[in-house]
Design a protein with these regions (language model features):
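Short conserved AdoMet
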Residues: 122
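N-terminal helical cap/lid subdomain that shapes the substrate entry/recognition surface
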Residues: 1-115, 138
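Switch/coupling loops of ABC transporter nucleotide-binding domains
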Residues: 125
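Asp-based, Mg2+/Mn2+-dependent phosphohydrolase catalytic module
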Residues: 1-4, 39, 82-84, 90, ...
């Protein structure tokens, strides 16, 4: 059956070119010389993600820059507190600003490139965004000039369903008004995008980038595997 609509993931797909956010942040720590090892960083990253997911820290009107700043504040606060503090609070404040400016600039560049691809896809098909986010995805899309490209936005914080539950992709299919087999999902996370998209009956294109770990995946599950977002335009049936 022909593809008639597309569902895109946001985080890791449109803003970091397929790289897991943990990798993006860790590289920022390394570039700016934060004196912690990767194991300590991973503990801080997981701590911050859990806090952001369970507490109303992010406001609906928070830009991505503000969101990233709050994330870094949690991570570096974790690393500069307690008996095993790795850095001083003064150093944490400086690292926070420097890493924020660095990574935010990279995200601006990546989303600008993603916008070109999305505009090309939109010329062919209706598009829906399906994202696990903090309740401010609308603000973030506007910040990076991505608003108006999607016919609908399905955000986990708004609908009460999170990936990897296939139900969130079914909501995306319903928003398109199509059948699952007429819909292709494009995402960077094998476990949170590709597997549940296939379980929902959709076609799937995996943006394979630098993951959180070095696991091996069954690349026969997605219908196509790409390493750059722009390659989605060259998938034969898209």
């Amino acid at each position: 059956m022909l593809i008639r609509g597309c569902i895109f993931d946001y985080g890791g797909t449109l803003d970091t070119a397929g790289r897991h956010w943990g990798r993006v942040l860790w590289d920022g720590y390394v570039r700016h010389g934060v004196p912690v090892d990767e194991a300590a960083f991973r503990d801080a990253y997981v701590f911050a993600e859990r806090r952001l997911g369970s507490c109303p820290i992010i406001r609906p009107d928070d830009t991505f820059r503000t969101t990233l700043d709050k994330k870094l504040a949690l991570e570096l606060g974790f690393l500069s507190s307690g008996e095993r503090a790795y850095i001083s609070e003064k150093d944490a404040a400086k690292f926070r600003k420097d890493i924020l400016d660095d990574i935010y600039e990279g995200v601006k560049q990546t989303t600008a490139e993603s916008r070109k691809v999305l505009k090309a896809v939109k010329a062919r098909f209706p598009m829906v965004l399906v994202s696990n986010f903090y309740g401010n995805i609308g603000t973030v899309l506007g910040e990076f000039w991505l608003d108006g490209l999607f016919d609908s936005v399905i955000e986990s914080a708004a609908v009460g369903v999170r990936k990897p539950d296939p139900a969130i992709f079914r909501l995306g299919v319903e928003a398109l008004g199509l059948l699952p087999e007429e819909t292709v999902v494009v995402g960077d996370s094998y476990d949170k995008d590709i597997v549940p998209a296939c379980q929902a009956g959709c076609r799937a294109v995996w943006l394979k980038g630098e993951g959180w770990d070095e696991r091996q995946y069954d690349e026969s599950l997605p219908d196509a595997v790409i390493t750059e977002l722009g390659q989605v335009l060259n998938v034969g049936w898209l």
